[in-house]
Amino acid sequence: MAQSSYSSGNSTSDLNKIVLDYLFKKGYSRTEAMLRLEISSVGAIPEEQQDWHIGASETYVQVYILLRDWIDGTLDLYKPKLQKVLYPIFVHSYLDLLQKNDPEMAIYFFESFRIEHEVLHGYDIRALAQLKIASDVEEIEIAQLYRKNKYRINFTRSTFDLLVQFLFENEVNGSGIIIRLLNQYIDIKITMPQVEGKEDPNVQAVYEMDEAKNEQTIISEQEGIPGHSEQLLDYNKQSIQLGLRPLSEEVVTTLKNLLEVKDKDVEGRNEALNKILHPAKNLVELLTEKENLINESTLESPSDPPLPPTKMKDIDYFVSLLESEQNSLILGKNATDPSVFMYTMHNTLSAVNCAAFSDDASMFALGCADSSIHLYSSTNNGPQPLVGSQNEPLQKSSLIGHTRPVFGVSISPQKEFILSCSEDGFTRLWSKDTKSTIVKYAGHNAPIWDVQFSPFGYYFATASHDQTARLWDVEHAAPLRVFVGHQNDVDCVSFHPNAAYLATGSSDHTTRMWDVRTGGTVRVFNAHHSPVSALCMSADGLSLASADESGIIKVWDLRSSNQHVSFVKHSSIVYSLSFSYDNKILVSGGADTDVNFWDLTYRNNLSDGEQSPLLFNFKTKNTIIQNLSFTRRNYCLALSSS
């Protein structure tokens, strides 16, 4: 029997080297690369053995750029997951360069790429910037934290295989540096789908699409360094002003005079008929309540964005809002059940891409794949005429001008104008009266996915495939602000009620909130595990709802930046969200053809006997929900297509 050529005292690392040498000599280079990554589970390699593929200083810069550019070019399905690896590679490349006694190259590397990680890891980036020489890596706490603790990342098998394939193909370009850093300092957890208690490698692609449905499996272990505080929490604690926009004294005086006349008219009719027509509070009382609410939040009210002078039509519009609020329903578990007034477009052959209702519930607009926009208006002059008038014919008109499919439409608060955005890269402002284009806005260099008027109608925002959102006003053809920070398509936008902030949802799985006055990010929410498909701000300005392509809905408290509640019911992408005007109900709908009403007083930590947060589930006749909108009177309008 042949004697073994290896002594029993050989260490695990020596055996690993022997296996790697054997694989290299036999030509199994891909297997070699995978082994280098997967042996990371045995623990950190001692410093004296960390000599494999050290690389020249310049190679660190080249290979980091190579990795970053490769990730940017991957499919959107994998990009958000692969981007997680860039930060720990950045940190350890910087520390390596310091330990190589090349502080000049280390500082160049750090300053060149730090901006990519400032938002999510700002605290640690600022701490790492204090390192100047090799001895700092051994002495300063933040460096030792990263060197002695592995950075945890959760990958699916297909994502991991893509990374390994890239590293294998680029070993001649220096990817061995990345392989070494992954092996020594990064703990990649491979999560596989479970099928009857067993792994099923044949469903990997399906699992990528449904990854968020297995959320508990994937995120059961926190990513990053265990026990190290999440830097995003500190970033999201910066002060923001969520108060509502106060009314000028002149406007309040004019409003009160008008409302007193209307209240006296109602009282006179009540006396004549010997009954109460309006049991609700009168309009002056409602205005006083609203003033008090605004005054309570005065310290949180932002400086007013510049707006055109208030006109009489603006005051009339505000009066109509108060009248709607006066007659609004009270919804909830112990109050009135919600109702849905559904408008369905039949036999569209998937031609309807988007829809929007007017603020007064008198008209809606459709954006279509044939590049046209269709307007449907009620001939009824009463309040919210689209509610309860199913047998009434609607007036239809078409707007023609775009050259590619239309993906977003929005109707101004006073329904004078319609905005549309298209794959052709342009946004158009249309006149409702003349049915013609007033302004054509150019700025994006890619398809535009969404557009929305601000609550005051003068400003609007767009979201685009070029990874930016932009702020515009109706009077200028060039953007006022460009919001840059997302790492993938910006898919949806939603204004805060005070118009000082804008929320954006992206295919990079994050939701951001921007200050429209400065163009800077003030909040980042990254709890979704698939592209964000819908957003909605609550009427009080304190909550933001976001939904993703997996059907998961999250509601965020904007003051604390904490997740208020999470809802799981939809089986596919959610296209539309809407808060009731009393901020107690959230309605959602999408491709699974269901309309769901959620109780916002619910909390995730169910107590004994507490019911489900789902108040009602309405099923359609297999029609896709394109848009949902609560009216000012808390009725729900919906538009679907088949």
Swiss-Prot record:
Self-association and partners: TFIID is composed of TATA binding protein (TBP) and a number of TBP-associated factors (TAFs) whose MWs range from 25-150 kDa.
One Gene Ontology term from the biological process aspect of the record: transcription initiation at RNA polymerase II promoter
PROSITE patterns named in the record: LISH (PS50896), WD_REPEATS_1 (PS00678), WD_REPEATS_2 (PS50082), WD_REPEATS_REGION (PS50294)
Keywords attached to this entry: Nucleus, Repeat, Transcription, Transcription regulation, WD repeat
GO MF annotation list: RNA polymerase II general transcription initiation factor activity; transcription coactivator activity
Listed GO CC annotations: cytosol; SAGA complex; transcription factor TFIID complex
Protein name per its UniProtKB record: Transcription initiation factor TFIID subunit taf73
InterPro entries on file: G-protein_beta_WD-40_rep, LisH, TFIID_NTD2, TFIID_NTD2_sf, WD40/YVTN_repeat-like_dom_sf, WD40_repeat_CS, WD40_repeat_dom_sf, WD40_rpt
Pfam families: TFIID_NTD2, WD40
Function (record text): TAFs are components of the transcription factor IID (TFIID) complex that are essential for mediating regulation of RNA polymerase transcription. Regulates the genes involved in ubiquitin-dependent proteolysis during the progression of M-phase of mitosis.
Organism whose genome encodes this protein: Schizosaccharomyces pombe (strain 972 / ATCC 24843)
Protein localization: Nucleus
Similarity remark: Belongs to the WD repeat TAF5 family.
Keyword RNA-binding: no
Keyword Transcription: yes
Superkingdom as given in the UniProt entry: Eukaryota
Domain LisH, chain residue ranges per copy: 11-43
Ranges of the WD repeats in the UniProt entry: 347-386, 401-440, 443-482, 485-526, 528-566, 569-608
